Amino acid sequence: IYPGHISISHTPRLAFLAVDPLHPIGIDAELWRDTLPALAPRFMNQREMAVYGASPELLLRAWTTKEAAFKALGIPQLVVSDIILPDDADAAVMTAAGRTLSLHFISPVEGHTVTLARLLPDGSEGK
């Protein structure tokens, strides 16, 4: 077994692999789907809808951020809707389940959004 942390995500067209030798990591890739706006209220609260619901790109970012954070946190009983997004859609750091995660956003191909979340050691603030 690899001595580190691995996360995998894919869309019908692309696949992504994230590896970190020290810290839990999560990656999520999504391709825009017309059903996403109808699903958004199931995983986003009203404040998140106001910040991230303004465009397809932000809605995809919200979904991939929650999914990547969920994977990095590794808490089976955690529900994606309980992961609260930061007020700033471009934030490089967020807190979820009492832990701090660094965030990286990638747009490799038009229509795709990829978010990488890395669980930071306790006491670090994006270092």
Model-found features: residue ranges?
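Core catalytic alpha/beta fold that binds nucleotide/phospho-ligands
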Residues: I1-K127
